[in-house]
Curated annotation (Swiss-Prot):
Gene name tied to this protein: rplU
Keywords, ordered alphabetically: Ribonucleoprotein, Ribosomal protein, RNA-binding, rRNA-binding
Family: Belongs to the bacterial ribosomal protein bL21 family.
SUPFAM superfamilies from the UniProt entry: L21p-like
Highest taxon of the lineage: Bacteria
Coiled coil stretches, renumbered: none
Subunit structure: Part of the 50S ribosomal subunit. Contacts protein L20.
InterPro entries on file: bL21-like, bL21-like_sf, Ribosomal_bL21, Ribosomal_bL21_CS
GO biological process: translation
GO cellular component: cytoplasm; ribonucleoprotein complex; ribosome
The name this protein goes by in its record: Large ribosomal subunit protein bL21
Function field: This protein binds to 23S rRNA in the presence of protein L20.
Length: 104
């Protein structure tokens, strides 16, 4: 069984036991989170699509880690004008372990 969920403005295809990184969620490590924005649920050839969400469907996950992604460098410059700006950014994320996909 798989589900397509939406969190942090992005969509993910998940199955039970999957590990995925999503945009930072306000939860502690080890805590359970319920993702109720389920766009579709499928098993084999059977697919149930929501409008926009599937009624009574929810995905339960546990928080494995709260961390930051590797640093990216943002560098702006204007040639011949001695204008240079260097900035780094590390995007925070939450790592989830999918435990259960339920549909009623």
């Amino acid at each position: 069984m798989y589900a397509i969920i939406m969190t942090g403005g992005k969509q993910y295809r998940v199955s039970e036991g999957d590990t995925l990184r999503v945009e930072k969620l306000p939860a502690e490590v080890g805590e359970k989170v319920v993702l109720d924005k389920v766009l579709a649920v499928g098993e084999g050839a059977d697919l149930k699509v929501g409008n926009p969400y599937v009624e009574g469907a929810k995905v339960t996950a546990s928080v494995q880690a709260q961390d930051k992604a590797p640093k990216i460098i943002v560098f702006k410059y204007k040639p011949k004008k001695n204008y240079r700006r260097k900035q780094g950014h590390r995007q925070p994320y939450t790592q989830l372990q999918i435990e259960k996909i339920e549909i009623q």
